[in-house]
């Protein structure tokens, strides 16, 4: 989602692969996968981000998510 990151692509891809493997192992459908990812994001925000910064970080996260979605193809 991020254009620039302090984390390497290799590190990100490795962790993403491991997380997707867990979802695949449990045959999680899209709605359950999204629920879990949303809960992880909420937990990280609540546990790791100072209360006064949570709203702005959540808004930036939501904007980054929306901007990273594939756009529907139009004919």
UniProtKB/Swiss-Prot annotation:
Source superkingdom: Bacteria
Pfam families referenced in this protein's UniProt entry, alphabetically: DUF1414
Gene3D superfamilies per the UniProt record, alphabetical: YejL-like
InterPro entries with a match to the protein in the record: UPF0352, YejL_sf
Sequence similarity: Belongs to the UPF0352 family.
Protein name stated in the entry: UPF0352 protein VF_1649
UniProt organism field: Aliivibrio fischeri (strain ATCC 700601 / ES114) (Vibrio fischeri)
């Amino acid at each position: 989602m991020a254009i620039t990151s302090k984390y390497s692509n290799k590190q990100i891809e490795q962790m993403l692969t491991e997380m997707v493997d867990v979802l695949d192992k449990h045959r999680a459908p899209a709605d359950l996968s999204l629920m879990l990812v949303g809960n992880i994001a909420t937990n990280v925000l609540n546990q790791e981000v100072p209360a006064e910064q949570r709203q702005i970080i959540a808004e930036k996260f939501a904007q980054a998510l929306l901007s990273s979605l594939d756009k529907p193809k139009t004919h």
